[in-house]
Amino acid sequence: MLILVLAINFLGTVYGYYWYLPQLLETPARFLIFVPDSPTATFFFLFVLLAFLMKRNAPLLEALALVTLVKYGLWAVAMNFLVLAVTGDLPWEGYMLIASHFAMAVQGVLYSPYFRFSFWHLAIAAVWTLHNDVIDYLFDMMPQYSMLSDYMTEIGYGTFWLSIFSIALAYFLVVSKKQTKLELM
């Protein structure tokens, strides 16, 4: 089962970086690591899955994966529904992105009982995630949705709160001592 999840996430990660390629070609080098949001989230998760296959945990990558899988999974769902609301149309790729990104968020939550990160790992993931918001919305490096350009201020504000929600959810699911921890193998 882990091999299948790994393979699906690998393909999604490759497709995600391909989707960002036009924007990456125009991005200043200092921002490159922060531009491809969703594929970077699944990239973190790929390393978590590889660690699981070796019967290990990778706490910092687990924290980064959970926070960013939830955040960017839900963000992409919201953006595609916003495109539909603004334009009245959504191509089939938009529906594919809704399904695949919702699955990203769900898999982060489903695997969270196996994660072993601490408050400090989560704090680092929180700084990464909030810093990414700053890069996206203060330096205009956010994913390019030209039909939504009139709403960037509101999208940026909502994205900040989505980051806070994702960080809080990760705290509740993993760091909180009340949660049951599971072993994968």
Swiss-Prot record:
Coarse class of the protein's main subcellular location: membrane
UniProt keywords, alphabetically: Cell membrane, Membrane, Transmembrane, Transmembrane helix
Keyword Nucleus: no
GO cellular component, one term: plasma membrane
UniProt KW Ribosomal protein keyword: no
Record membrane topology: Multi-pass membrane protein
Name of a matching Pfam family: DUF1405
Subcellular locations according to the entry: Cell membrane
InterPro entries: DUF1405 (IPR009845)
Membrane-traversing stretches: 32-52, 66-86, 155-175
PANTHER family: DUF1405 DOMAIN-CONTAINING PROTEIN (PTHR40042:SF1), HYPOTHETICAL MEMBRANE SPANNING PROTEIN (PTHR40042)
Protein name in UniProt: Uncharacterized protein YpjA
Organism whose genome encodes this protein: Bacillus subtilis (strain 168)
Gene name per UniProt: ypjA
